[in-house]
Regions:
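Core AdoMet radical
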Residues: 117-127, 138-166, 179-195, 207-226, ...
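Short, well-ordered amphipathic alpha-helices
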Residues: 170-171, 197-205, 263-269, 296
């Protein structure tokens, strides 16, 4: 068997280019927020698998998984993996490459014959206590009341599958398939609001399996407590992607109704622990000028880094809709900031004579509903 684990990064990339194979369908059990199954977080989900109606075995052995596995066994791309295929055609690093590197230490020859779950990637429905301005009812239950009053959200439907993690039995069934697991990935909604999440962790601790398991969370941080930190000490590694989209009143507007003093309290809880914390920031026209303050916080608390993503929806919040005056100001301000993704984003900003009038309209709608004042907080969208 080829020892992929011993390959250097460049050699691994070369191997991936020569071999159309991904280990993810053989080791990874992944769900969507709205109650569907998928091969990984980048694949197309199967509409034939409803998490409210299936158990782990019936999903793992479903033809959706088997068809993908057979495609990879035959050095072919499955239909559900078009995103990785497209990225690699442009020589952009894909999820397939990440998964193959992550699981290079396993016996792939054996897994090709007998797939075994080593990772549960669980998006635990849409239960959430915040209603961020770039979110929707699909990812937050607290958005339900507001979305009926806002024009661009009227097309969203509240689907039964969004409640799968609360009403279904799948999370209870997971403990019957967890003995080999090395990684648990929790996202939401807000995953720490789900009580069954604690049940799974305590089961692993009681069975003395936790020291072999790493945990990853996408979290808004509001629910983190000393009890969680004590619980996490029993695991091999814990990584938090802690969402923060600005500082002080900017974050409070974006991640409504969060209080920034509470965010700093959670930062102090996590400071000087062995938990890996990365700040997760979604950049848009509204918060781009505040990004340097997030990097300052990361350094102040000695966190592991800042993950920069880009707001795609609603479209009016995209960076390209800033005025040219602000774009020029950003290019100058961020010239020396040491973050390649951010540098690439700023360099790619085109001067297009845009006007953020739709963004101004959206924020005005939010202000009426939430009794806020965006003009005081984001004056640059009027410059």
């Amino acid at each position: 068997m080829l020892k992929l684990e011993s390959l250097k990064m460049d050699d691994m990339r070369s191997w991936n280019k020569k071999n159309i194979f991904c280990i993810a369908p053989f080791v990874n059990f992944s769900t969507t927020t709205d109650g569907l199954a998928r091969l990984c977080c980048q694949s197309t989900a199967s509409t034939d698998i409803n998490l409210l109606e299936h158990d782990v075995d019936s999903i793992w052995n479903h033809q959706y998984y088997e068809q993908a596995r057979n495609s990879f066994r035959n050095n072919q791309w499955p239909e559900s993996c078009s995103m990785c295929k497209n990225l690699e055609s442009k020589d952009i690093k894909s999820r397939r490459e990440l998964e193959n590197r992550r699981w290079a230490h396993l016996n792939w020859d054996e897994l090709k014959k007998n797939p075994k779950i080593y990772c549960f990637d669980l998006r635990l429905g849409n239960q959430c206590n915040l209603k961020c301005i770039m979110c929707t009812p699909r990812n937050s239950t607290t958005w339900y009341d507001d979305y009926k009053q806002i024009e661009h959200l009227k097309g969203w439907k509240v689907l039964p599958g969004l409640q799968w993690a609360l009403k279904g039995d799948l999370l209870d069934d997971i403990i019957n398939h967890i003995d080999n697991v090395e990684l648990l990935y929790f996202s939401g909604g807000e995953p720490l609001l789900n009580k069954k999440h604690n049940f799974i962790l305590n089961y692993l601790i009681d069975k003395k399996l936790s020291h072999n398991v790493s945990l990853i969370y996408d979290t808004n941080g509001t629910q983190i407590s000393k009890k969680h930190i004590e619980l996490w000490h029993a695991f091999k590694k814990v990584s938090l992607n802690f969402s923060i989209d600005g500082t002080y009143e900017i974050d409070e507007y974006i991640r409504y109704p969060i209080k920034f003093d509470d965010v700093l309290t959670k930062f102090n809880l996590l400071k000087n622990t062995d938990i890996e914390v990365k700040l997760q920031c979604a950049l848009g026209a509204h918060n781009l000028l505040d990004i340097t303050n997030i990097f300052t916080l990361q350094e102040e608390y000695n966190f592991a880094g800042v993950n920069v993503t880009v707001v795609q929806w609603p479209e009016c919040m995209q960076i390209k809709y800033l005025t040219d005056n602000i774009k020029i100001k950003c290019k100058k301000k961020f010239n020396k900031l040491n973050n390649k993704r951010l540098q690439d984003m700023i360099s790619a900003l085109e001067l297009t004579n845009n006007n953020p009038i739709k963004l101004q309209k959206y924020f005005t709608q939010l202000d009426k509903i939430r009794n806020t004042n965006h003009k005081e907080i984001f004056p640059w969208i009027y410059e």
